[in-house]
UniProtKB/Swiss-Prot annotation:
Family designation: Belongs to the universal ribosomal protein uL29 family.
Keyword match Ribonucleoprotein: yes
GO biological process: translation
GO CC, one annotated term: cytosolic large ribosomal subunit
Name of the protein this chain belongs to: Large ribosomal subunit protein uL29
Originating species: Desulfosudis oleivorans (strain DSM 6200 / JCM 39069 / Hxd3) (Desulfococcus oleovorans)
Keywords, comma-separated and alphabetical: Ribonucleoprotein, Ribosomal protein
Keyword presence, Ribosomal protein: yes
Entry GO MF terms: structural constituent of ribosome
Length: 62
């Protein structure tokens, strides 16, 4: 996701997106460990998206 897309989310939408991204990251890690993941850069991209959403959520909590 692009940072502008994440900033446009409401607090509830951002929390839901965080749950979805964490589940996706778990699945990617599992597939990587079993040798089924071809595009390993998806791990890094998903991890960075999680960090972006967490940053936006912390801004809502201030």
């Amino acid at each position: 996701m692009k940072p502008d897309e994440i900033k446009a989310l409401s607090a509830d939408e951002a929390k839901q997106k965080l749950v979805e991204l964490k589940a996706a990251y778990f699945n990617l890690r599992f597939r990587h460990e079993t040798g089924q993941l071809d595009n390993t850069s998806m791990l890094e991209k998903t991890k960075k998206d999680i960090a972006r959403v967490k940053t936006v959520l912390s801004a809502y909590n201030r």
